[in-house]
């Protein structure tokens, strides 16, 4: 797992996986490479990209570009999640729940990379079903997208934040 920093708005970029894939043609096999990357600002913005090319650096570059284009905003609560969330994509299911300060990121492989670049500092997370990195990343992003802050819920219901939080 490589960690590459760029100056483009101080985005953190992480390479999750590089695979060699092949296409069988009449004359044999044509090999190409795929790269899965995540990009985030460490403050609630995160995106992932999947690139494919004949050479590894080109695949990584394509993936990074796609990740920068497909960023979402995540409403964080002091470096952790707002509430427990579940995310799914095909055969992968992920469960993430907020954790107290000092816990750290307790998550596996691909999920850890997404949470780190998103700016989550304390979380308990578990992946169920398929652990294919692409599906786990998509499921994690799905879970983070579905997370609602108390402000969002209050606005949707037409109530005050105190009423939502039960204070």
Curated annotation (Swiss-Prot):
InterPro entries: Ribosomal_Su5_D2-typ_SF (IPR020568), Ribosomal_uS5 (IPR000851), Ribosomal_uS5_bac-type (IPR005712), Ribosomal_uS5_C (IPR005324), Ribosomal_uS5_N (IPR013810), Ribosomal_uS5_N_CS (IPR018192), Ribsml_uS5_D2-typ_fold_subgr (IPR014721). One of its GO terms (cellular component) is small ribosomal subunit. Keywords: Ribonucleoprotein, Ribosomal protein, RNA-binding, rRNA-binding. One of its GO terms (biological process) is translation. It comes from the Bacteria. Part of the 30S ribosomal subunit. Contacts proteins S4 and S8. With S4 and S12 plays an important role in translational accuracy. This is Small ribosomal subunit protein uS5. It comes from Klebsiella pneumoniae subsp. pneumoniae (strain ATCC 700721 / MGH 78578).
């Amino acid at each position: 797992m490589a960690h590459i920093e760029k100056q483009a708005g101080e985005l953190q970029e992480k390479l999750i996986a590089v695979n060699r894939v092949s296409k069988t043609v009449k004359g044999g096999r044509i090999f190409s490479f795929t790269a899965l990357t995540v990009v985030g600002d460490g403050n609630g913005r995160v995106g992932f990209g999947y690139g494919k090319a004949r050479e590894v650096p080109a695949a990584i570059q394509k993936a990074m570009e796609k990740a920068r284009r497909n960023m979402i905003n995540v409403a964080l609560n002091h470096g952790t999640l707002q509430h427990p969330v579940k995310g799914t994509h095909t055969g992968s299911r992920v469960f993430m729940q907020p954790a107290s300060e000092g816990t750290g990121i307790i998550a596996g492989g691909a999920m850890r990379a997404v949470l780190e670049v998103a700016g989550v500092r304390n979380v308990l997370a578990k992946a169920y079903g398929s652990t294919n990195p692409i599906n786990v990343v998509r499921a994690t992003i799905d879970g983070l997208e579905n997370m609602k802050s108390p402000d969002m819920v209050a606005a949707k219901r037409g109530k005050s934040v105190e009423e939502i939080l039960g204070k």
